[in-house]
């Protein structure tokens, strides 16, 4: 990755018990999250050029659009604008969807195309399944973690890979504008394979 290229990030808010969405991708629990400082959401949104989402989450967001509040109905509460890739095995079904590019490809191709578009800005993954696929190929450069003070008990797990490999992370920064949300930035500890 060149010095003038953006990063591939996986950013999320999760419940204390490790869910990033409730049953049926419900996001109403996000109201329990501590609000971030003024300008924090806009700052984070400005760093992102391309969002990569999965089909299940995209469909749920569309179906729940009238039920979701401003914060959860659009990426970054509506503060973000850019390109959204939706990875799906049925891209033709989203041919008329506004503001999205539906793609039927593997994660390496999707991230490569996203990085080309992003330039110096970041590519943000907002799907647990897509992030899992990216981690399998060591494609995530940064993990952005926020925690909401709520137990969900059920829903979409943050990371659920029975038999999967261990991935170690190192803390590289804290989000000073979100101390009550436990905002933390990590990068993967990658082992060198050279001699």
PLM features: residue spans?
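Enzymes that bind and transform nitrogen-containing heteroaromatic metabolites
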Residues: 1-195
């Amino acid at each position: 990755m060149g010095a003038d290229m953006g990063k591939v990030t996986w950013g999320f808010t999760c419940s204390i018990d490790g869910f990033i969405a409730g049953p049926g991708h419900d996001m109403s629990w996000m109201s329990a999250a501590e609000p971030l400082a003024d300008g924090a959401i806009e700052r984070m949104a400005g760093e992102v050029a391309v969002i990569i989402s999965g089909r299940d989450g995209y469909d749920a967001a569309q179906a729940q659009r009238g039920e979701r509040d401003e914060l959860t109905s659009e990426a970054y509460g509506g503060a973000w604008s850019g390109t959204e890739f939706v990875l799906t095995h049925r891209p033709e079904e989203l041919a008329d969807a506004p503001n999205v590019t539906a793609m039927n490809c593997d994660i390496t191709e999707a991230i490569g195309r996203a990085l080309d578009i992003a330039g110096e800005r970041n590519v943000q993954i907002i799907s647990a399944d897509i992030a899992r696929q990216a981690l399998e190929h060591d494609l995530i450069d940064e993990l952005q973690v926020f925690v909401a003070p709520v137990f969900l008990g059920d829903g979409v797990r943050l990371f659920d890979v029975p038999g999967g490999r261990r991935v170690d992370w190192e803390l590289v920064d804290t989000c000073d504008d979100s101390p009550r949300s436990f905002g933390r930035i990590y990068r993967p500890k990658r082992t060198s394979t050279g001699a």
